[in-house]
Structure formats: C-alpha cells, structure tokens
Amino acid sequence: MAKKIIGYIKLQIPAGKANPSPPVGPALGQRGLNIMEFCKAFNAATQGMEPGLPIPVVITAFADKSFTFVMKTPPASILLKKAAGLQKGSSNPLTNKVGKLTRAQLEEIAKTKDPDLTAADLDAAVRTIAGSARSMGLDVEGVV
C-alpha cells in the first residue's frame, strides 16, 4: 500500500547550499520533516552542479514524516542571464535591449530545460526560450 501524502512543498534552493535557515527550515518544519536529512540529501544530489544556481525542488511529504524530492531544471531566466552575462533583465524590454543571444546559445539552454518543457521538438523549445529572452529585453538572432 502506498504511503499517505500530506502535502507538497515547492522551493527554489541554491545548488549545494541547502541549510535549515529560511525558507527551507520553516517549510519542512511545518510538516514535521527532518530538515537536516533533506539538506544533506539535496546538497549531495546537487554536488555536480554549479554552486549557487537556484534549483526548483518539489518535496512530497508523507504522513509517516518521510519525504521524497524531485529536482527540476534551473529557471530559464537564470540561464538566459548567465548566457548573456547580465545581472538582471531590462526594465522596459520593448525599447531598452540589454543583450543579444544567438540561436546556438538558445539551443543549449533549450537542451538544458528540455525535461521540464512541454515542447514537441527542439525547435519548439528554442522558440519558447526565445520568447522568454525577448520578454527580458534580449535580442534574439536566428529565431523567427
């Protein structure tokens, strides 16, 4: 028989830097989960990733105080800013362009994001990422 699920917790935690302080501690503490056990497991799972890269994670809490977690891919906006070498996007994306990305860079980001995108193929995924880039004030080359 499957364990009874008491809730889901969605967080964005920097890779390799999970610790009991907010937001992790209070979110897990409310459900009575072992905070340090999660922190150790998350940090071990993100060990090979770039330190500090925000990783979305969905934690499933069970009635017996156990948990499982699923890591998603980093947000597209973070990957786009990193590829363009920016600190933040444009405050007015229609008139104030802050950077430029090529199709090759967008394809690389689309391949990274592929498990979380619902796109039918790589070209559709690239167009999705290109739309995110445009909304951040980035010029996109080679994508219609």
From Swiss-Prot:
GO terms for cellular component: cytosolic large ribosomal subunit. Pfam families: Ribosomal_L11, Ribosomal_L11_N. InterPro entries: Ribosomal_uL11, Ribosomal_uL11_bac-typ, Ribosomal_uL11_C, Ribosomal_uL11_C_sf, Ribosomal_uL11_CS, Ribosomal_uL11_N, Ribosomal_uL11_N_sf. One or more lysine residues are methylated. HAMAP family: Ribosomal_uL11. Part of the ribosomal stalk of the 50S ribosomal subunit. Interacts with L10 and the large rRNA to form the base of the stalk. L10 forms an elongated spine to which L12 dimers bind in a sequential fashion forming a multimeric L10(L12)X complex. This is Large ribosomal subunit protein uL11.
